[in-house]
UniProtKB/Swiss-Prot annotation:
Native organism: Burkholderia mallei (strain ATCC 23344)
Catalytic activity: adenosine(2503) in 23S rRNA + 2 reduced [2Fe-2S]-[ferredoxin] + 2 S-adenosyl-L-methionine = 2-methyladenosine(2503) in 23S rRNA + 5'-deoxyadenosine + L-methionine + 2 oxidized [2Fe-2S]-[ferredoxin] + S-adenosyl-L-homocysteine; adenosine(37) in tRNA + 2 reduced [2Fe-2S]-[ferredoxin] + 2 S-adenosyl-L-methionine = 2-methyladenosine(37) in tRNA + 5'-deoxyadenosine + L-methionine + 2 oxidized [2Fe-2S]-[ferredoxin] + S-adenosyl-L-homocysteine
Pfam families: Radical_SAM, RlmN_N
InterPro entries: Aldolase_TIM, Methyltransferase_A, RlmN_N, RNA_MTrfase_RlmN, rRNA_lsu_MTrfase_RlmN/Cfr, rSAM
Protein name: Dual-specificity RNA methyltransferase RlmN
Principal location class: cytoplasm
Keywords: 4Fe-4S, Cytoplasm, Disulfide bond, Iron, Iron-sulfur, Metal-binding, Methyltransferase, rRNA processing, S-adenosyl-L-methionine, Transferase, tRNA processing
Length: 378
């Protein structure tokens, strides 16, 4: 075993775990047993995996680990939203947010430390991009949150029956652009869908993208889950300013990709997310332009009141203006919702996932600040 690379079993989806067990001389069914222990029973070590042969447990010791997130903080908002801040090393942290509702519980999962897309209205992009998260770091957010929430409710670990599951929906809408970390995100989502792990349906796992068109096509071919697109502007000139990726994949190309995706998607519509910015993209004329640009894509709109942060120079649209904008869309027969701001008192609201621990080098480069780790009070 000397010199062997230690494997984090959270990094392995079902196929990867079968291959790993095979490398140890074990049969494929052992992979399912391991997967259930890790993802359904929250096993922290191998000794407690009582239906595994002792010889296999001994093989795993020293060769494999079950990685667990390094939680820096755990905060609960007045509205019940819960945010965990997770250390991912080198002065970086990512955030995981649970949003409880009457009939469901939604977990917002991060895929990168920082983000390279740098949307103008999103605080995460202002810290720059540090690195991609691993599969284990992504699915580990779901594992950590599910069992922490169960513990708070007095529910024991075990198979994820509908009556016991706390997290019913996962949205890949946290820090980062998921499709720019495709090789780690897709295995993580496979585990979310796997009946030997979390057993979520494809309709209940949503990936949000700013519009990485080639990877949208690949996702549709390999693992079509529900799709949300961060749109935020009704024309290329404005979207170029708000979502710089638009310069590479403009609206016509993006709309065509949405049409292709719908041919294989588990839902018959795309959700378009639209951050409402006062005097920038929120007029009734913008709404009519938005209807025109999306007319060939079955869709619904989710209007998001902007959550201000100092570096943006932007202001949230007034409530009445958001309602007028929404009414134009509704009058055209398009399902439109206005997102209720949740968790903003703990900086967990949409667009606020900047991480309280910031990469020292990038922070210094961007602000000229001294090289310290900055921790923001929450």
């Amino acid at each position: 075993m000397a010199g062997e690379t230690i494997v984090n079993l959270l990094d392995l989806d079902a196929e990867g775990l079968v291959a790993y067990c095979g490398s140890l001389g074990e049969k494929a069914f052992r992979a399912k047993q391991l997967q259930r222990w890790i993802h359904q029973y929250n096993a922290a070590d191998f000794d407690g995996m009582t239906d595994l042969a002792k010889s296999l447990r001994e093989k795993l010791k020293g060769r494999a680990v079950i990685g667990t997130p390094d939680i820096l903080s755990d905060h609960v908002s007045a509205d019940g939203t819960r945010k965990w801040l997770i250390n991912v090393g080198n002065g970086n942290a990512v955030e995981t947010v649970f949003i409880p509702e009457e009939t469901r519980g939604t977990l917002c999962v991060s895929s990168q430390a920082g983000c390279a897309v740098n949307c103008r209205f999103c605080s995460t992009g202002k810290q720059g991009f540090s690195r991609n998260l691993s599969t284990g770091e992504i699915v580990g957010q779901l594992r950590m949150a599910e069992f922490a929430l169960r513990a708070s409710l007095g529910r024991a670990p075990g198979p994820n029956g509908k009556a016991e599951r706390v997290i019913t929906n996962v949205v890949m809408m946290g820090m980062g652009e998921p499709l720019l970390n495709y090789s780690a995100v897709v295995p993580a989502m496979r585990l979310m869908l796997d009946d030997n792990a979390y057993g979520l349906s494809r309709r209940r796992v949503t990936l949000s993208t700013s519009g990485v068109v080639p990877m949208m096509d690949r996702l549709g071919a390999e693992l079509p889950v529900a799709l949300a697109v961060s749109l935020h502007a009704p024309n290329d000139a404005l979207r170029d300013e708000l979502v710089p990726l638009n310069k590479k994949h403009p609206l016509r190309e993006l709309m065509a990709a949405c049409q292709r995706y719908l041919k294989v998607a588990p839902r018959d519509f795309i959700t378009f997310e639209y951050c409402m910015l006062d005097g920038v993209n929120d007029t009734e004329a913008h709404a009519r332009e938005l209807l025109a640009v999306t007319r060939d894509v079955p869709c619904k709109f989710n209007l998001i009141p902007f959550n201000p942060f100092p570096e943006s120079g932007l202001v949230r649209s007034k409530t009445e203006q958001i309602k007028r904008f929404a009414q134009v869309l509704i009058d055209a027969g398009v399902v439109t919702t206005i997102r209720k701001t949740r968790g903003d008192d703990i900086d967990a609201a949409c667009g606020q996932l900047a991480g309280a621990v910031k990469d020292r080098t990038r922070l210094a480069e961007r602000t000229g600040a001294s090289k310290i780790i900055e921790v923001r009070a929450v």
